[in-house]
Amino acid sequence: MNSIFPQYSFDRSQIRWSDYLKDLTPVEEYGGVKFKREDKFAPLGFNGVNGSKMRQCLWLVDEWVKTKNITGIVSGSVVGSPQHPFISSICKHYDLGCLIVTGSKHYMKHTNMILAHRMGAQFKVEKIGYARALQSKAFQLAKKLPGHEVLETNITVDERLNPPERIEAFHKIGSYQVANIPDDIETMIIPCGSCNSVVSILYG
């Protein structure tokens, strides 16, 4: 199965992932049900990191690179989160440092942490492993690291930390994807966790 990317490479001299942020993923029909294939937003191929959260994560990093000329990103989330391979692969694409805050001494037993390690991420182990505590530690560490930004837990933009125009821009990048949803669709079933993708869809 193919993704929407014409080639798969970390090398920005070969391909810039951000050029495809607004490209539409296809709608495909199986057994009379139509699926919006967000899993085909896959810059490293169909079996690699993919999806709408990957797109939003890429947008965040691309904005930081363009507006702040950052040198690295600090991220804190639970060991099982796909946030880890997302941010580490994007940092590798942009040649940025990636520091992941974890609450597990045995983080290398977890698949997403192994993937992040392979992408070049470094790790800081803390005593508390709850998501909110890890994000707090990430912000503390970023203050000590020049040129670093924090990827918020769940790849979101908290209204307490971000101005309204940034929150709107964050959701706008996902909102474009409704453009090719067929007009005859009457009912949409949307899986949700953090609800970021849901908000983007509704905004679109």
Residue ranges of predicted features:
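Conserved mixed alpha/beta catalytic, RNA-binding, or beta-rich assembly cores of soluble enzyme
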Residues: C192-G204
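Aromatic/hydrophobic pocket-lining residues that form π-stacking "cages" and hydrophobic walls in ligand
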Residues: I87, A138, I201
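Positively charged, low-complexity intrinsically disordered leader regions
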Residues: N2-T71
